Each structure stands twice: as C-alpha cells, then as structure tokens.
Amino acid sequence: ITFLLISNLCFSQLKSVIINSETKEKIPYVNIWVENENIGTTSNEKGEFTLEINSTKTILFSAIGFETKKISSDLINNILELKPIVTELDEIVISKKLSQKLIIGKFKKSKINNYFGCGIKPWITARFFKYTEEYERTPFLEKIRILTKSDVKNSKFNIRLYGVNEKGEPENYIYNENIIGIAKKGKKITEIDVSKLDIEFPEKGFFIAIEWLIIENNKYEYKYTMEGSRKKLEGISYEPAIGTVPAETDENSWTFNQGKWKKIWKNNGGSFKRYKDKYSLLAIELTLTN
C-alpha cells in the first residue's frame, strides 16, 4: 500500500483546453506527445485533453493549420494557445467541366488482411504519392478511398495532407483544415469526398496521412490471452484499423510518433505470406479529376 501511495504522488495530470490564439475558438483533434517518449493523447471535440506524466516533460502539440508548439509541461495552464499558420493561396481557376477522371492506387478489398491499428497512444502513418506527367490533365483531388476495419460504429479518423521536404519526410500542410473520415463497423471501404476543397496535386508529390484519434467514441475494450496462458487480459484499442498493401521498399511509407517522423519498419516472419519481409503501405485509392 505504501508503494502505491508513493507511486501515485509521483504522477501529475495535465489538463487544459487548446484554443486558437487569434479567434479563441477551441481546437479539436490536436495530436499531443511527450517528446522522445511513448506517451501521448488527442484533444477531444471541445479541445480538451488530459495527460499523466511523472515529472516535468517537453510536450509537443501538432494540429492542422497551426504551428507546432513545443512547451515545458510546468508552463501549461488551463488554457493553451496555438498560433494559426498564415498561408497565401494561389488563385485557382476552376473549370465547370468534370469530364476527365483518373484513379490511382487501386487495391482489392478481398486481398487485404494486414492492418495498422492503434492502442492507447496516438500516432500517424503516411503514404507518399509521386507526381507524374500523366496527372497534368486531372490535377485535382476528388475522392479518397481507404480500407478500414472497425470494431465500433462510426469511428472517426483524421486525414492530414502534407508536402515533402528535402529528406523525403512529410512537411508543411497543403490543406490547412481537418478532413475527418468516418468508418462504419466492419471491414469497409471508407470514401471521403474532397471535390469541393480544390486540392491540386503538387508537382513535388504529397503525403496522405492517417491520424488516429484518442477519443471516447473510438474506444474499443476487449479481452485476450497470451500464448501459453489461460489468463484473460484486458486490452484497449482506438478504432478504426487501416488496411495496408505490401511494398518492396520503405520509401513511400512513414510514421509519426514521439513527436518525430520515421520510416516504416519491415514486416517480420509472423506476417501473412503476402506481407512477409515486405513494408506495409496504406491502402489508399485516389480519384483525380480536371
């Protein structure tokens, strides 16, 4: 009992509401990480978050349309402000004719049996789409189709669209607002219509990133047993899982956790045969149009 009391005293809980420094509006779905540690969470729809830490830490806050903020935990008060990014958008002349379409990244739902999933810590995984001259006639993004598998109804995930830096990493948003996908229960193809957002395929290519949201609506509790044991353990996941396709190299697949971008890992021998010793790439299909 003494040990438990001492342990509890060592932990402190950060609790705050994240707002826009200019408009004072609350910011939902902010990705929050303890720098260089596997501790993190997501702000809810009201911009609220709680986070338990055992000492003074450096906390990273990342949200679409805002500058990433790095701050010491002992400086976080009841209200935390993020500064919006000012983006100068080029004038876009949009044609009324939407006669041409091109689909890239096609996948077969029936062949996918490997997924990225999320436990109790938030993370982001991204897929790079390279630009080719073929896309010149259909430069606008119309639809995003993603293979999802959810154990709860209407789980939400966030889509971030990034450019690419000199190191090949995701950097700088090409669209400065959240794009929320909603996955129905079961194995489904989730389609997001972005035709009204006027997103043009950058000539340097771009990343589509999936961000898991640590919110109550996505929480799934289950029981499982370890190999060689009959004892039932309790587990928590945050839905949905996102389907992947196998790739020969890691060049187009990145992950973001602990506040840093890293290349995807190689699948081990325990993976399905089709994925064994390959790299997992998000199963994403894009419809391009003029």
Task: Describe the predicted segments one by one.
Residues 38-48:
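Short, acidic Ser/Thr/Gly-rich low-complexity loop/linker segments typical of extracellular
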Residues 156-230:
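Aromatic- and Gly/Pro-enriched, solvent-exposed loop/edge beta-strand patches characteristic
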Residues 34, 60-71:
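A short, solvent-exposed loop/turn motif at the edges and junctions
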Residues 14-21, 47, 80:
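A short, amphipathic beta-strand motif
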Residues 88-164, 211-290:
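Beta-sheet-rich sandwich/jelly-roll-like modules and their strand-loop junctions
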Residues 14, 22-36:
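Short, ordered, surface-exposed loop/turn motifs in non-cytosolic proteins
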Residues 75-96, 192:
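Extracellular beta-sheet/turn segments enriched in Thr/Pro/Gly and aliphatic residues
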Residues 1-17, 290:
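Bacterial Sec-dependent N-terminal signal peptides
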